[in-house]
Swiss-Prot record:
Role, per record: Probable transcription factor.
InterPro entries on file: HD (IPR001356), HD-Zip_III (IPR044830), Homeodomain-like_sf (IPR009057), MEKHLA (IPR013978), START-like_dom_sf (IPR023393), START_lipid-bd_dom (IPR002913)
A Pfam short name: Homeodomain
Biased composition (Polar residues): 146-164
DNA-binding region range list: 29-92
This protein's UniProt keywords: Coiled coil, DNA-binding, Homeobox, Nucleus, Transcription, Transcription regulation
GO MF term (any one): DNA-binding transcription factor activity
Name this protein carries in UniProt: Homeobox-leucine zipper protein HOX32
One cellular component term from this protein's GO annotations in UniProt: nucleus
CDD domains: bZIP, homeodomain, START_ArGLABRA2_like
Organ and tissue specificity: Expressed in seedlings, roots, stems, leaf sheaths and blades and panicles.
Region called Disordered, residue ranges: 7-31, 146-172
Entry's localization field: Nucleus
Length: 859
């Protein structure tokens, strides 16, 4: 520990090098190094723990306060702190590299196992191909061969998915019989997780790597639908098992999981009999329930296994509960294989294999229950993402949004999602009842006169439901959409709330949170609605879901000659906005909140859910080049690049579900119902208009769209940025071999430094950023325009910009000193230097300001 107690730092004069415990240290030139005593090091370390980068005044104060440092010059102390920070940075970097190395080693092992499995699958397919050729030459011969893991008879390939069909009858109503079922389930699950019992096809875009989610595959030509995932997480197997067993915490479609019986086994495992209910994703289908045997056991190699299957007449076993209005679905052998990794962490294999009884739903909705990609997104990938999220939060690297712990924010997300699912399904046992319709069947109205039963005892509902009596009313509808990508539609609805929302209805919902709500509003064709400000709270690791607060500013509405002018707030959850995520459900759910935003605040979620219906095609859908960079303003009508193959975007279908909830007082229930019914019809009409406007832009550019004045296309802006930088500084910003606008856009988008553009206004807001800029701000192009330049700069940065601003406007550019700024999530970001320059349009008029932050990194 001599190195920890005795520090050598660069100095300017000779100092005494003698110190206790330093006898074993190498001799050094006294003209270059200063030897500190352990007492001096202890004093410096104490200050370093409080302030790693003390100012000059603080260092001088330190010398005055600590007499033992009086023989050391302030400059030498400055160097000591510099070296100490360097050692700390090196230690963190070494630790990070060790972690990455462990991840790569484990991932390499996983890939080798996957390669072995694929080689077995290829060998089997080669064998079966030869057999099929033989059958074609000898059609009269029918042979059964079971030498491989499949059975081929008369040219038909039947996988052994249901050995229970040939299992002899046995008594499974006792622990021994249940253990036999459990052991068979374990063997079948392992053959799917690590063997070739199912033909797995890797999902497009899911590539492995040290920071990737893992290997994701879906089933091909098997009974039911199945999905498989392999990944690495930095949690121990027992913690992973605990998280996975808590299915409602990560499976958003799970309504409840009731463990009815727990039976210990002789090998140290447990058998559980579980009744589970899941929500229906839309109002057009019934919810599902499951009667499941779950078996938890350890393997000889130290792995932990959780496997499960449904108990049916063919498997035997006790009968489960029967609940009206639910369709009984089946879990085929599925589960989780959790293997410990050297150095900590776990390697997880997940298999989800279900038969959702697709024939019980209308034909147009069957892809919802027949698509393995939808299953993968909802269950398999969701489980892996949730575990990685918990691991990331446990590491302490997760920034807190609004001063709240990540677990609290995650609870808000779960409550929003669950509340929306409750509204869509309207279960009678939660207190929901249908109201009589007005003759049309397009909008369903349900009411709940026992809202406390619905929102739960942990929520303070006294503000929401007055003492004079009241409840919750829900208006909901579902519709089919053609040629509208779900992610694109939800992004538009999120960014352009004024296109579909009525400010009077928003005000009514917000007033319900206050002591004296006013009368039910009438719908207006127009009305003053102020700007919408998006305040980020939290997002998941891969930004597939984000929680935010929406502030609706500047409302001015008249109700009974009372003028209201007050900001309103919504808690909003947005997910599934990545157009490249096959089978992903896009959702926008929001609920009014008050300024206090308490942890137990009551939430009445409303919103939209769009689910793709065409899950059978395996071909990747055509996407725009540089999709995020293809338009400067979301919904601004950016030109879409024509695709040579539009067949994948034509004839795509999705189902849209809309549900809006309102509180009511008993004497106003009919009035609120009439308002809600009309409002949902108005929203449906608005969404249909939006869908018609969006759909043509995805059909190979067959219909030209024009950008609003002042909103150039992305490649035009890239050309302006590069040309203006070269004009002002004489240097090339974008080094490309080609002079085409596409290459300029690509070069700017992939530039390693953060490049951003902001408006030339009194309060500049960002209008565009390249990928590095979005990463630095921890945002997306959708939310970028809600971030102002002033918010990300610290005091020193703002002072430097104000000082150099006249120079920027006169000379066209200026260099700003390095410093620290703040991302949208509140994380500090350091940069070595910043460059600001004036971006000129083709007619040499100022269009915007561009900033480049050089060599930025999170602190």
């Amino acid at each position: 520990m001599a190195a920890a107690m005795v520090a050598a730092v660069h100095g300017v004069g000779r100092q005494d090098r003698s110190s206790p415990g330093g006898g074993g240290a190498p001799q050094v030139d006294t003209g270059k190094y200063v030897r500190y005593t352990p007492e001096q090091v202890e004093a410096l370390e104490r200050v370093y723990g409080e302030c790693p980068k003390p100012s000059s005044l603080r260092r001088q104060q330190l010398i005055r306060e600590c007499p033992i440092l009086s023989n050391i010059e302030p400059k030498q102390i400055k160097v000591w702190f510099q070296n100490r920070r360097c050692r700390e940075k090196q230690r963190k970097e070494a630790s990070r590299l060790q972690t990455v190395n462990r991840k790569l080693t484990a991932m390499n092992k996983l890939l080798m196992e996957e390669n072995d499995r694929l080689q077995k699958q290829v060998s089997r397919l080669v064998y079966e191909n030869g057999y099929m050729r033989q059958q074609l030459h000898n059609p009269s011969v029918a042979t059964t061969d079971t030498s491989c893991e499949s059975v081929v008879t008369s040219g038909q390939h039947h996988q052994q998915q249901n050995p229970a069909a040939t299992r002899p009858q046995r008594d499974a109503n006792n622990p021994a019989g249940l253990l036999a079922i459990a052991e068979e389930t374990l063997a079948e699950f392992l053959s799917k997780a690590t063997g070739t019992a199912v033909d797995w096809v890797q999902m497009v875009g899911m590539k492995p790597g040290p920071d990737s989610i893992g290997i994701i595959a879906v089933s091909h030509n098997c009974s039911g639908v199945a999905a498989r995932a392999c990944g690495l997480v930095s949690l121990e197997p027992t913690k992973v098992a605990e998280i996975l067993k808590d299915r409602p915490s990560w499976y958003r479609d799970c309504r409840c999981v009731d463990v009815l019986h727990v039976i210990p086994t002789g090998n140290g495992g447990t058998i559980e009999l579980i009744y589970m209910q899941t929500y229906a994703p839309t109002t057009l289908a019934a919810p599902r329930d499951f009667w499941i045997l779950r078996y938890t056991s350890g393997l000889e190699d130290g792995s932990l296994v959780i496997c499960e299957r449904s108990l049916t007449q063919s498997t035997g076993g006790p009968s489960g509960p029967n609940t009206p209005n639910f369709v009984r679905a089946e879990v085929l052998p599925s589960g989780y294989l959790i293997r410990p990794c050297e150095g900590g962490g776990s390697m997880i294999h997940i298999v989800d294999h279900v038969d959702l009884d697709a024939w019980s739903v209308p034909e147009v909705l069957r892809p919802l229950y027949e698509s393995p990609k939808i299953l993968a997104q909802k269950m398999t990938i969701a489980a892996l993402r949730h575990i990685r999220q918990i691991a990331h939060e446990s590491s302490g690297e997760m920034p807190y949004g609004g001063g709240r712990q990540p677990a609290v924010l995650r609870t808000f997300s779960q409550r929003l999602s669950r509340g929306f699912n409750d509204a869509v399904n309207g279960f009678p046992d939660d207190g929901w009842s249908l109201m009589s319709s007005d003759g049309a069947e397009d909008v369903t109205i349900a009411f709940n006169s026992s809202p406390n039963k619905l929102v739960g005892s942990h929520v303070n509902s006294s503000q929401l439901f007055s003492a004079i009596g009241g409840g919750i009313l829900c208006a909901k509808a579902s519709m089919l959409l053609q040629n509208v990508p779900p992610a694109l539609l939800v992004r538009f609805l999120r960014e352009h709330r004024s296109e579909w929302a009525d400010p009077g209805v928003d005000a009514y919902s917000a007033a319900a949170l206050r002591a004296s709500p006013y009368a039910v509003p009438g719908l207006r064709a127009g009305g003053f609605m102020g700007s919408q400000v998006i305040l980020p709270l939290a997002h998941t690791l891969e930004h597939e879901e984000f929680l935010e607060v929406i502030r609706l500013e500047g409302h001015s509405l008249c109700h009974d000659e009372v003028v209201l002018s007050r900001d309103m707030y919504l808690l909003q959850l947005c997910s599934g906005v990545d157009e490249n995520a096959a089978g992903a459900c896009a959702q926008l759910v929001f609920a009014p909140i008050d300024e206090s935003f308490a942890d137990d605040a009551p939430l009445l979620p409303s919103g939209f859910r769009v689910i793709p219906l065409d899950g059978k095609t395996d071909a990747p859908s055509a996407t725009r080049t540089l999709d995020l960079a293809s338009t400067l303003e979301v919904g601004s009508g950016g030109t879409t690049r024509a695709s040579s193959d539009t067949s994948s975007t034509c004839n795509t279908r999705s189902v849209l579900t809309i549900a809006f909830q309102f509180s009511y007082e008993n004497h106003l229930r009919e009035s609120v119902a009439a308002m809600a019914r009309q409002y949902v019809r108005t929203v449906v009409a608005s969404v249909q208009r939006v869908a018609m406007a969006i759909a043509p832009s995805r059909l190979g550019g067959q219909i030209e769209t024009k950008n609003p004045p002042g909103s150039p296309e992305a490649h035009t802006l890239a050309r302006w940025i590069g040309r203006s930088y070269r004009f002002h500084t004489g240097a090339d910003l974008l080094r490309t071999d080609s002079q085409s606008t596409d290459s300029s856009l690509k070069a700017m988008w992939q530039h390693s430094d953060s490049i951003m553009c902001c408006s030339l206004k009194a309060a500049p807001v960002f209008t565009f950023a390249n990928q590095a800029g979005l990463d630095m701000l921890e945002t997306t192009l959708i939310a970028l325009q809600d971030i102002s330049l002033e918010k990300i700069l610290d005091d020193d940065g703002r002072k430097a910009l104000c000082t150099e601003f006249p120079k920027i406007m006169q000379q066209g550019f200026a260099y700003l000193p390095g410093g620290v700024c703040v991302s949208s999530m509140g994380r500090p970001v350091s940069y070595e230097q910043a460059v600001a320059w004036k971006v000129l349009s083709d007619d040499d008029t100022p269009h915007c300001l561009a900033f480049m932050f050089v060599n930025w990194s999170f602190v």
